[in-house]
């Protein structure tokens, strides 16, 4: 999906509001994914899945940092996420559907924390952005 100039503005504005809460929101989204979609836990056999575990916080921070990098490279997501795509496709072998599940959980988390800013237009822009990130992350599976 092509991101319009309005989408890019919505994404950057929304991400600025996330700011220093990125790691916290990332961890909340990861925890929400594990609770809502328990099969996703199979990729993390060494994790402590209790609320607020350090492993969930650390992975949430990684997710947030990767998305922050992607927001900074909206015109070159494949270049910005190439290493991460290789990791997930060749080493971790994560089922591509899990990216969609995490994206959904992230949208729910952001809507929960920023309800007044999470307008239909912002929701649509973030959804397109996360779909594009998912597409890039799964592009090397083929």
Curated annotation (Swiss-Prot):
Heme b binds at residue 88. O2 binds at residue 59. Keywords: Acetylation, Heme, Iron, Metal-binding, Oxygen transport, Phosphoprotein, Transport. The modification N6-acetyllysine is found at residue 17. The modification Phosphothreonine is found at residues 9, 109, 135, 138. The modification Phosphotyrosine is found at residue 25. One of its GO terms (biological process) is hydrogen peroxide catabolic process. GO terms for molecular function: haptoglobin binding; heme binding; iron ion binding; organic acid binding; oxygen binding; oxygen carrier activity; peroxidase activity. Signal peptide: none annotated. Gene3D superfamilies: Globins. The modification N6-succinyllysine is found at residues 8, 12, 17, 41. InterPro entries: Globin, Globin-like_sf, Globin/Proto, Hemoglobin_a-typ, Hemoglobin_oxygen_transport, Hemoglobin_pi. The keyword Transport applies. Red blood cells. PANTHER family: HEMOGLOBIN FAMILY MEMBER, HEMOGLOBIN SUBUNIT ALPHA. Involved in oxygen transport from the lung to the various peripheral tissues. Belongs to the globin family. This is Hemoglobin subunit alpha-1/2.
């Amino acid at each position: 999906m092509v991101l319009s100039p309005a989408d890019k503005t919505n994404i950057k504005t929304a991400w600025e509001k996330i700011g220093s809460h990125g790691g916290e929101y990332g961890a909340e989204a990861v925890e929400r994914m594990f609770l809502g979609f328990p099969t996703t836990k199979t990729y993390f056999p060494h994790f402590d899945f209790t609320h607020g575990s350090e492993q969930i916080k650390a992975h949430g921070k990684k997710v947030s940092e990767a998305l922050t990098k992607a927001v900074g490279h909206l015109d070159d997501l494949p270049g910005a996420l190439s290493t991460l795509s290789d990791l997930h496709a060749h080493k971790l072998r994560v089922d591509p559907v899990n990216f969609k599940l995490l994206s959904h959980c992230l949208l729910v988390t952001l809507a929960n924390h920023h309800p007044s800013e999470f307008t239909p237009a912002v929701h649509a822009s973030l959804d397109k952005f996360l779909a594009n990130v998912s597409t890039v992350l799964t592009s090397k599976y083929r």
